[in-house]
Every structure is written in structure tokens, then in C-alpha cells.
A protein has these predicted regions:
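Catalytic beta-strand/loop cores that center a nucleophilic Ser/Cys/Thr
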Residues: 314-356
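Active-site glycine-centered loops adjacent to acidic/histidine catalytic or metal-binding residues
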Residues: 126, 280, 323, 364
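RNA-binding accessory domains that recognize and position tRNA/RNA substrates
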Residues: 2-243, 257, 368, 380-387
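Active-site-proximal beta-strand elements of phosphoester/diester hydrolases
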Residues: 206-211, 319-320, 359-363
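A glycine-centered loop/beta-turn motif at secondary-structure junctions
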Residues: 350-387
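Short clusters of small/polar residues that mark proteolytic maturation junctions
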Residues: 32-33, 70, 321, 352, ...
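Proline-centered loop/turn at the N-terminus of a beta-strand
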Residues: 120, 206, 275-277, 293, ...
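Cysteine-nucleophile active-site neighborhood
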Residues: 242, 246-247, 252-318, 326, ...
């Protein structure tokens, strides 16, 4: 970069000043990129070192500002192959260093990708300090100011603007008690088939997937052995059972599982009639349907390096995770057996029904991004529905 180019870049950054105001009054300054519009949401941190496009397109991040702890973001751009859903549902992206794309797979820069999706971003933030703050004090409601418009009561002065933004963060309703699954689910049912198995479609088992925010790679894994019908989150148990499924899959999704009451009732009606497998939000909903309760974690689990112990085998799996709530250990009913635990904080990571064909895990065995240590769980589901 020439001196003139560097000076032009520096001047442009000065004109795009932005800040992230946390509800506890802490302010982080940076430079705006992506869509130039302000947002309010909950700040979380993700410890993954790569896979930012898969993270951005994970519907489980609806309503949240995602802080990436990796030092540099954007250098491999974005492409159509790494998309995990039909859109971006997160409220914003927070990074340390942003770089323009230089990769043969890239079709669009991250900056332009965020602009097209209407998602604001901020870079130049001390993400290490922000992550430590969230770790020590818990996830925070926040206001992200990236627009050119003045904010606050009179738009005068940086301090007044920041104080106004902090108050907006405090007044936001947050994720607790909110049903975001109904906001990210599909509008109508659709079918997913593996191209390699299409000739044998009629002989494959039929899996109905409840879409609470399902990721594309989950559907790919299911389609490796089944005909998959994806249905909206509020589809009744009666309608699902009329489809004569060999198994029902409960997908991942965002926000508070206790608020998704309609799904809990549907799961109760399905249990015992066909095998059930749940992931992430689906795990929490299955557990609630069986009598357990969920609660909020201090700063959640977000990343692709979380160690989980399989209690049956003693094996430790490195897993991809994305959740702010978890099943509370003291509420697990007699009918459920805990199968997996998190080695960082001993929270529940998996359960199995003792008498019915139903099991679930809190983490993401499909990876995307992340390791493949737990893909065997899809094979367990296949064996269960093919008995």
C-alpha cells in the first residue's frame, strides 16, 4: 500500500467512527463496516479461529452481536458454498482487525456481504478486553452505533451520545423469555434429498425435521441416509405424525427454550411414537418435554473447541457449540439419563430417555465450522430409526 493509499484509508476510517455501548456503561470504540445502521442486541463471544461465514449464517445467533476472538477477519471473503441458512439473523459483528478478501473461493468481501444482509459491524475493537469483560461479568445487552445519524436526546457531544446508547441497551427486552425460533423458521415445509441417493429415495427412511433455526449442514448429514421433510417450528404433532415419519429431528435454534412452549407440547405428543433426536435448542426442548428445566449460562458456550465427555465410553470429544441456555442438572427427571458433560464447567451436554427411543445433545455434531468428533450421533439416529 502506498503512502497516499494508506492516508486515504486512515481518513476514511476516521469518518466511520463507531462504538459499542454495553448496558453496564462500558464503551468500546472502533470503525464501522457492513451496513450503516444502529442495532441493539446481546453481545456474546465466539472462540473459533475460522469459519466466520458459517457463524454469521447460523440462525442460533438471532438477536446477538457476535464478537470473534480470532485476531483477523475477512481475509478469505465469502462464498455461496459456506452458507448455513437462508440469511443472516445476528444483529451485528464485532472484530479486532478487518481485512479485504484475497482468496480464490471468494465471491464477495465480508464488508459487502454484511451490507447486502443489512447487518452492521465494527472493527478495531479490543476484542480480548471485551471477551474478558463478558467472561467476568456475563453476556451484556448492548447498543451498536455505526450510522452517520446523530443519536441521543439532542445529538450533541460524544459523551451524551454514549450515555443515551447505554440507556437504549438497558431498555432492550433481551433474549430471556423470547421465542426467536418462530422468527427464523421456514415459512412452509420443504424436502431435502442427497443427489447420490435420489435413485433409492422410495426405500430410504423418512425423517421429519422441526426447523427452529436449522443449519444446512445438519440437513446434509440427515440426507445421507434419509428422505428429509423440513417443517416450520409451529407444525402440530398431529400433522407431523400424519406424514408417517420413521424419526423426528429437533433442530438447533436461538434464544430461550422455555419460551418455545408450542414445541414442548408437540414433542410430548411425539415421544414414544417414533424415535427422536435433538440438537442444541432441540436438546433443551426435548429435556423440557420430559420434565427438566433450563437456565441461563453466565456467558454461554460459543466456539468449536469445547471438550465434552461421553459418559458411556469415557471418550472426550472436541465439539462445536452455540448456546446461552442449558439444562439444569438438579432438574433432570428420573426418565432421563445424562450421557455427556462439558469438561469446562460440568454442564449437561447430552441426555437419553431410559425407556423411549429419544436422545439429544447440546452441541453441534454436524460441525460447520468445527471438528467432526461427534458425527457418529447421526449414525446412532440412523440405526434407531432403521430398527
Amino acid at each position: 500500500m502506498t503512502t497516499a493509499e494508506y492516508q486515504a484509508k486512515w481518513q476514511a476510517e476516521r469518518e466511520r467512527k463507531a462504538f459499542l455501548a454495553l448496558a453496564d456503561g462500558t464503551i468500546f470504540h472502533g470503525v464501522a463496516f457492513g451496513a450503516r445502521k444502529d442495532k441493539v442486541g446481546e453481545v456474546v463471544f465466539n472462540t473459533g479461529m475460522s469459519g466466520y461465514q458459517e457463524i454469521l449464517t447460523d440462525p442460533s445467533y438471532a438477536g446477538q452481536f457476535v464478537t470473534l476472538t480470532t485476531a483477523e477477519v475477512g481475509n478469505y471473503g465469502t462464498n455461496p458454498e459456506d452458507i448455513e441458512s437462508r440469511g443472516l439473523f445476528l444483529h451485528g459483528l464485532v472484530v479486532n482487525a478487518y481485512d479485504e478478501a484475497s482468496n480464490f473461493r471468494s465471491t464477495k468481501s465480508l464488508d459487502q456481504y454484511l451490507k447486502d444482509a443489512g447487518v452492521p459491524g465494527i472493527y478495531g475493537v479490543d476484542t480480548r478486553a471485551l471477551t474478558i469483560h463478558l467472561r467476568d461479568h456475563g453476556n451484556q445487552r448492548a447498543y451498536l452505533h455505526v450510522s452517520d445519524e446523530e443519536i441521543g436526546a439532542n445529538g450533541e457531544g460524544r459523551k451524551e451520545n454514549e450515555e443515551w446508547a447505554v440507556e437504549q441497551a438497558r431498555q432492550w427486552e433481551g433474549l430471556d423469555g423470547q421465542d426467536y425460533a418462530s422468527k427464523v423458521t421456514c415459512e412452509k415445509e420443504y424436502h431435502v434429498d442427497s443427489s447420490s441417493l435420489i435413485a433409492h429415495r422410495s426405500s430410504l427412511p423418512h425423517v421429519v425435521c422441526y426447523d427452529f433455526g436449522v443449519k444446512t449442514n445438519i440437513l446434509r448429514n440427515l440426507a445421507e441416509f434419509a428422505r428429509v421433510t423440513v417443517v416450520p417450528a409451529k407444525t402440530t404433532a398431529e400433522a407431523v405424525l400424519k406424514m408417517k415419519p420413521d424419526g423426528v429431528f429437533l433442530s438447533n435454534g436461538p434464544a430461550d427454550p422455555a419460551a418455545v412452549t408450542y414445541a414442548q407440547e408437540n414433542i410430548k405428543m411425539i415421544l414414544g411414537k417414533v424415535p427422536v433426536f435433538g440438537i442444541c435448542l432441540g436438546h433443551q426442548l426435548l429435556s423440557i418435554a420430559c420434565g427438566a428445566k433450563t437456565g441461563r449460562l453466565k456467558f454461554g458456550h460459543h466456539g468449536c473447541n469445547h471438550p465434552v465427555k461421553n459418559l458411556a465410553t469415557g471418550a472426550v470429544e472436541i465439539t462445536s457449540q452455540n448456546h446461552n441456555f442449558a439444562v439444569m442438572d438438579e432438574t433432570v427427571p428420573e426418565c432421563l439419563e445424562v450421557t455427556h458433560v462439558n469438561l469446562n464447567d460440568n454442564t449437561i451436554e447430552g441426555v437419553r430417555h431410559k425407556t423411549l427411543p429419544a436422545f439429544s445433545v447440546q452441541y453441534h455434531p454436524e460441525s460447520a465450522p468445527g471438528p467432526h468428533d461427534s458425527k457418529y450421533l447421526f449414525d446412532e439416529f440412523r440405526k434407531m430409526i432403521c430398527k
